[in-house]
A protein has these predicted regions:
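Transmembrane alpha-helices and adjacent helix-loop boundaries
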Residues: 1-297
Length: 297
Protein backbone atom coordinates (compact mmCIF):
# COMPACT_ATOMS: atom_id res chain seq x y z
CA UNK A 1 0.00 0.00 0.00
CA UNK A 2 2.82 2.36 0.90
CA UNK A 3 4.62 1.55 -2.34
CA UNK A 4 1.41 2.31 -4.26
CA UNK A 5 1.18 5.70 -2.53
CA UNK A 6 4.76 6.59 -3.42
CA UNK A 7 4.17 5.48 -7.01
CA UNK A 8 1.26 7.89 -7.40
CA UNK A 9 2.51 10.63 -5.08
CA UNK A 10 3.72 12.91 -7.92
CA UNK A 11 0.27 12.67 -9.53
CA UNK A 12 -1.34 13.59 -6.21
CA UNK A 13 1.00 16.56 -5.87
CA UNK A 14 0.11 17.82 -9.34
CA UNK A 15 -3.57 17.45 -8.46
CA UNK A 16 -3.07 19.61 -5.36
CA UNK A 17 -1.33 22.28 -7.45
CA UNK A 18 -4.02 22.14 -10.14
CA UNK A 19 -6.71 22.44 -7.47
CA UNK A 20 -5.06 25.63 -6.22
CA UNK A 21 -4.93 27.08 -9.74
CA UNK A 22 -8.59 26.12 -10.29
CA UNK A 23 -9.66 27.80 -7.04
CA UNK A 24 -7.98 31.00 -8.20
CA UNK A 25 -9.96 30.86 -11.44
CA UNK A 26 -13.14 29.93 -9.58
CA UNK A 27 -13.25 32.99 -7.35
CA UNK A 28 -13.34 35.50 -10.23
CA UNK A 29 -15.84 33.46 -12.23
CA UNK A 30 -18.07 33.17 -9.18
CA UNK A 31 -18.09 36.96 -8.89
CA UNK A 32 -19.15 37.30 -12.52
CA UNK A 33 -15.73 38.42 -13.77
CA UNK A 34 -14.60 36.70 -16.97
CA UNK A 35 -10.91 36.92 -16.15
CA UNK A 36 -8.30 34.46 -17.40
CA UNK A 37 -5.40 36.26 -15.72
CA UNK A 38 -4.80 33.34 -13.34
CA UNK A 39 -2.10 31.77 -15.52
CA UNK A 40 -0.19 35.05 -15.76
CA UNK A 41 -0.24 35.58 -12.00
CA UNK A 42 0.77 31.95 -11.41
CA UNK A 43 3.78 32.65 -13.62
CA UNK A 44 4.63 35.79 -11.64
CA UNK A 45 4.42 33.86 -8.36
CA UNK A 46 6.58 31.03 -9.70
CA UNK A 47 9.32 33.29 -11.08
CA UNK A 48 9.23 35.50 -7.97
CA UNK A 49 9.76 32.47 -5.74
CA UNK A 50 12.44 30.96 -7.97
CA UNK A 51 14.44 34.20 -8.16
CA UNK A 52 14.27 34.89 -4.43
CA UNK A 53 15.03 31.30 -3.41
CA UNK A 54 18.01 30.96 -5.77
CA UNK A 55 19.52 34.40 -5.20
CA UNK A 56 18.85 34.89 -1.49
CA UNK A 57 18.45 31.35 -0.17
CA UNK A 58 15.18 32.04 1.61
CA UNK A 59 12.78 29.26 2.57
CA UNK A 60 9.74 28.70 0.38
CA UNK A 61 7.57 29.12 3.48
CA UNK A 62 8.75 32.72 3.72
CA UNK A 63 8.69 33.31 -0.02
CA UNK A 64 5.24 31.82 -0.75
CA UNK A 65 3.30 34.25 1.53
CA UNK A 66 5.29 37.14 0.01
CA UNK A 67 4.37 35.86 -3.46
CA UNK A 68 0.71 35.81 -2.38
CA UNK A 69 0.97 39.48 -1.41
CA UNK A 70 2.53 40.26 -4.80
CA UNK A 71 -0.31 38.39 -6.52
CA UNK A 72 -2.88 40.26 -4.45
CA UNK A 73 -1.35 43.58 -5.49
CA UNK A 74 -1.33 42.56 -9.16
CA UNK A 75 -4.98 41.52 -8.89
CA UNK A 76 -5.91 44.90 -7.43
CA UNK A 77 -3.97 46.75 -10.12
CA UNK A 78 -5.60 44.68 -12.85
CA UNK A 79 -9.06 45.45 -11.49
CA UNK A 80 -8.60 49.19 -12.09
CA UNK A 81 -8.42 49.23 -15.92
CA UNK A 82 -10.84 46.29 -16.14
CA UNK A 83 -13.53 47.98 -14.05
CA UNK A 84 -15.35 49.28 -17.14
CA UNK A 85 -15.00 46.09 -19.19
CA UNK A 86 -17.39 43.16 -19.18
CA UNK A 87 -17.67 39.66 -20.64
CA UNK A 88 -15.43 38.87 -23.62
CA UNK A 89 -13.69 42.25 -23.32
CA UNK A 90 -12.48 41.27 -19.84
CA UNK A 91 -11.29 37.94 -21.23
CA UNK A 92 -9.35 39.61 -24.05
CA UNK A 93 -7.79 42.19 -21.72
CA UNK A 94 -6.67 39.56 -19.20
CA UNK A 95 -5.37 37.36 -22.03
CA UNK A 96 -3.25 40.35 -23.08
CA UNK A 97 -1.89 40.47 -19.52
CA UNK A 98 -0.97 36.78 -19.73
CA UNK A 99 0.87 37.42 -23.00
CA UNK A 100 2.75 40.37 -21.49
CA UNK A 101 3.90 38.25 -18.55
CA UNK A 102 4.97 35.47 -20.94
CA UNK A 103 6.94 37.95 -23.05
CA UNK A 104 8.73 39.33 -19.99
CA UNK A 105 9.59 35.80 -18.81
CA UNK A 106 10.90 34.98 -22.28
CA UNK A 107 12.96 38.09 -22.99
CA UNK A 108 14.18 39.17 -19.54
CA UNK A 109 16.87 36.52 -19.85
CA UNK A 110 19.33 37.80 -17.20
CA UNK A 111 16.56 37.60 -14.60
CA UNK A 112 14.36 34.71 -15.73
CA UNK A 113 16.67 32.57 -17.83
CA UNK A 114 14.73 33.32 -21.00
CA UNK A 115 13.44 30.40 -23.08
CA UNK A 116 15.53 27.94 -21.06
CA UNK A 117 13.84 29.02 -17.85
CA UNK A 118 15.27 28.63 -14.36
CA UNK A 119 16.78 25.36 -13.18
CA UNK A 120 18.12 23.91 -9.92
CA UNK A 121 15.45 25.60 -7.83
CA UNK A 122 15.68 24.17 -4.29
CA UNK A 123 12.91 21.63 -3.73
CA UNK A 124 11.37 22.55 -0.39
CA UNK A 125 7.70 21.69 -0.97
CA UNK A 126 6.27 18.31 0.01
CA UNK A 127 2.86 16.69 -0.37
CA UNK A 128 2.04 17.66 3.20
CA UNK A 129 2.93 21.29 2.47
CA UNK A 130 0.68 21.36 -0.59
CA UNK A 131 -2.16 19.75 1.40
CA UNK A 132 -1.76 22.34 4.14
CA UNK A 133 -1.80 25.25 1.67
CA UNK A 134 -4.88 23.89 -0.11
CA UNK A 135 -6.66 23.28 3.20
CA UNK A 136 -6.02 26.87 4.31
CA UNK A 137 -7.31 28.29 1.02
CA UNK A 138 -10.39 26.03 1.15
CA UNK A 139 -11.11 27.13 4.71
CA UNK A 140 -10.85 30.81 3.80
CA UNK A 141 -13.01 30.50 0.69
CA UNK A 142 -15.50 28.23 2.48
CA UNK A 143 -15.86 30.76 5.29
CA UNK A 144 -16.23 33.55 2.75
CA UNK A 145 -18.98 31.68 0.88
CA UNK A 146 -21.32 31.81 3.87
CA UNK A 147 -20.78 35.53 4.49
CA UNK A 148 -22.42 38.55 2.88
CA UNK A 149 -19.46 38.82 0.48
CA UNK A 150 -20.12 35.31 -0.83
CA UNK A 151 -23.80 36.13 -1.42
CA UNK A 152 -22.80 39.35 -3.17
CA UNK A 153 -20.46 37.42 -5.49
CA UNK A 154 -23.39 35.14 -6.38
CA UNK A 155 -25.67 38.11 -7.00
CA UNK A 156 -23.07 39.79 -9.23
CA UNK A 157 -22.68 36.62 -11.27
CA UNK A 158 -26.42 36.15 -11.70
CA UNK A 159 -27.46 39.73 -12.45
CA UNK A 160 -25.03 42.61 -12.06
CA UNK A 161 -27.68 45.25 -12.78
CA UNK A 162 -29.97 43.98 -10.01
CA UNK A 163 -27.02 43.78 -7.60
CA UNK A 164 -26.11 47.39 -8.41
CA UNK A 165 -29.70 48.52 -7.82
CA UNK A 166 -29.48 47.03 -4.31
CA UNK A 167 -26.63 49.41 -3.49
CA UNK A 168 -23.81 46.91 -3.95
CA UNK A 169 -20.46 48.39 -4.98
CA UNK A 170 -19.71 46.41 -8.13
CA UNK A 171 -16.23 47.91 -8.58
CA UNK A 172 -15.19 47.15 -5.00
CA UNK A 173 -16.36 43.54 -5.02
CA UNK A 174 -14.85 42.85 -8.44
CA UNK A 175 -11.56 44.26 -7.12
CA UNK A 176 -11.88 42.00 -4.08
CA UNK A 177 -12.40 38.97 -6.33
CA UNK A 178 -9.34 39.94 -8.41
CA UNK A 179 -7.26 40.37 -5.25
CA UNK A 180 -8.26 37.00 -3.79
CA UNK A 181 -7.72 35.26 -7.12
CA UNK A 182 -4.31 36.88 -7.55
CA UNK A 183 -3.17 35.92 -4.05
CA UNK A 184 -4.19 32.28 -4.53
CA UNK A 185 -2.65 32.07 -8.01
CA UNK A 186 0.70 33.53 -6.93
CA UNK A 187 0.77 31.37 -3.78
CA UNK A 188 0.39 28.14 -5.73
CA UNK A 189 2.72 29.41 -8.45
CA UNK A 190 5.40 29.86 -5.78
CA UNK A 191 4.69 26.41 -4.35
CA UNK A 192 4.98 24.93 -7.83
CA UNK A 193 8.40 26.54 -8.27
CA UNK A 194 9.48 25.08 -4.93
CA UNK A 195 8.31 21.64 -5.99
CA UNK A 196 9.36 20.96 -9.59
CA UNK A 197 13.04 22.12 -9.58
CA UNK A 198 12.71 24.10 -12.82
CA UNK A 199 10.27 26.46 -14.55
CA UNK A 200 10.00 27.63 -18.17
CA UNK A 201 7.81 30.24 -19.89
CA UNK A 202 5.90 27.65 -21.96
CA UNK A 203 4.58 26.03 -18.76
CA UNK A 204 2.33 29.05 -18.27
CA UNK A 205 0.62 29.14 -21.62
CA UNK A 206 -2.53 27.92 -23.31
CA UNK A 207 -2.39 24.39 -21.83
CA UNK A 208 -2.54 25.65 -18.24
CA UNK A 209 -5.14 28.27 -19.18
CA UNK A 210 -7.36 25.59 -20.72
CA UNK A 211 -6.86 23.28 -17.75
CA UNK A 212 -7.87 25.85 -15.13
CA UNK A 213 -10.94 26.97 -17.09
CA UNK A 214 -11.98 23.38 -17.83
CA UNK A 215 -11.59 22.39 -14.18
CA UNK A 216 -14.02 25.10 -13.07
CA UNK A 217 -16.46 24.41 -15.92
CA UNK A 218 -16.42 20.66 -15.25
CA UNK A 219 -16.73 20.96 -11.48
CA UNK A 220 -18.92 24.05 -11.20
CA UNK A 221 -18.42 27.60 -10.01
CA UNK A 222 -21.00 27.93 -7.23
CA UNK A 223 -19.47 25.51 -4.70
CA UNK A 224 -15.83 25.54 -3.61
CA UNK A 225 -15.80 21.78 -4.19
CA UNK A 226 -16.53 22.27 -7.88
CA UNK A 227 -12.98 23.34 -8.80
CA UNK A 228 -11.56 20.53 -6.65
CA UNK A 229 -13.60 17.88 -8.47
CA UNK A 230 -12.81 19.52 -11.81
CA UNK A 231 -9.09 19.57 -11.03
CA UNK A 232 -9.27 15.89 -10.03
CA UNK A 233 -10.90 15.02 -13.36
CA UNK A 234 -8.38 17.05 -15.37
CA UNK A 235 -5.44 15.52 -13.45
CA UNK A 236 -6.41 11.88 -13.04
CA UNK A 237 -8.44 11.24 -16.20
CA UNK A 238 -5.43 11.54 -18.59
CA UNK A 239 -3.55 9.07 -16.37
CA UNK A 240 -6.46 6.62 -16.32
CA UNK A 241 -6.82 6.98 -20.09
CA UNK A 242 -3.09 6.52 -20.73
CA UNK A 243 -3.69 3.31 -22.77
CA UNK A 244 -5.54 5.47 -25.30
CA UNK A 245 -2.26 7.28 -26.09
CA UNK A 246 -2.89 10.44 -28.15
CA UNK A 247 -6.66 9.84 -28.01
CA UNK A 248 -6.61 10.97 -24.38
CA UNK A 249 -7.08 14.55 -25.53
CA UNK A 250 -10.13 13.48 -27.51
CA UNK A 251 -11.59 11.89 -24.38
CA UNK A 252 -11.04 15.11 -22.41
CA UNK A 253 -12.81 17.14 -25.08
CA UNK A 254 -15.75 14.73 -25.31
CA UNK A 255 -16.16 14.72 -21.53
CA UNK A 256 -16.21 18.52 -21.45
CA UNK A 257 -18.87 18.63 -24.18
CA UNK A 258 -21.03 16.03 -22.40
CA UNK A 259 -20.85 17.90 -19.08
CA UNK A 260 -21.69 21.25 -20.72
CA UNK A 261 -24.74 19.69 -22.44
CA UNK A 262 -26.13 17.60 -19.59
CA UNK A 263 -24.72 19.39 -16.52
CA UNK A 264 -24.23 23.01 -17.65
CA UNK A 265 -23.57 24.13 -14.08
CA UNK A 266 -20.81 21.56 -13.63
CA UNK A 267 -20.68 18.16 -11.97
CA UNK A 268 -20.86 19.30 -8.34
CA UNK A 269 -23.32 22.16 -8.81
CA UNK A 270 -25.44 20.04 -11.14
CA UNK A 271 -25.69 17.17 -8.66
CA UNK A 272 -26.48 19.58 -5.83
CA UNK A 273 -29.24 21.12 -7.92
CA UNK A 274 -30.70 17.69 -8.75
CA UNK A 275 -30.68 16.74 -5.05
CA UNK A 276 -32.42 19.99 -4.10
CA UNK A 277 -35.11 19.52 -6.73
CA UNK A 278 -35.86 16.06 -5.41
CA UNK A 279 -36.21 17.39 -1.87
CA UNK A 280 -38.16 20.54 -2.81
CA UNK A 281 -40.02 19.88 -6.07
CA UNK A 282 -41.50 23.23 -7.07
CA UNK A 283 -41.83 25.47 -4.06
CA UNK A 284 -38.41 27.11 -4.06
CA UNK A 285 -37.84 30.63 -5.37
CA UNK A 286 -35.67 31.30 -8.43
CA UNK A 287 -31.95 31.37 -7.75
CA UNK A 288 -31.57 35.05 -8.65
CA UNK A 289 -34.32 36.10 -6.23
CA UNK A 290 -32.78 33.97 -3.49
CA UNK A 291 -29.34 35.56 -3.93
CA UNK A 292 -30.86 39.05 -3.96
CA UNK A 293 -32.81 38.40 -0.75
CA UNK A 294 -29.67 37.07 0.95
CA UNK A 295 -27.77 40.22 -0.04
CA UNK A 296 -30.54 42.46 1.34
CA UNK A 297 -30.34 40.59 4.63
Amino acid sequence: MINLFYAYQPLLDFFLLNAGFALSQYIVLRAGVFSIATVGIVSVGAYFAAIVMKNYGLSIWLVAPAAAVVGLAIGLLLSIPLARLRGPYQAIATLAFVQIVAAIALYAEPLTGGALGMNDIPKQVSTLGLLLALAIVLYILGSLSSTRVGHIFDALRQDEAVAGSLGISITFHHALAFALSGAIAALFGALQAGYIYSIEPHQYGFAMLAMTLAAVILGGRRSIWGPIVGAAIMTFLPEIARPLAENRLLLNGLLLIVVIIFLPRGVVDGLIEVARRRRRPAASAPVGEKAASEVRA
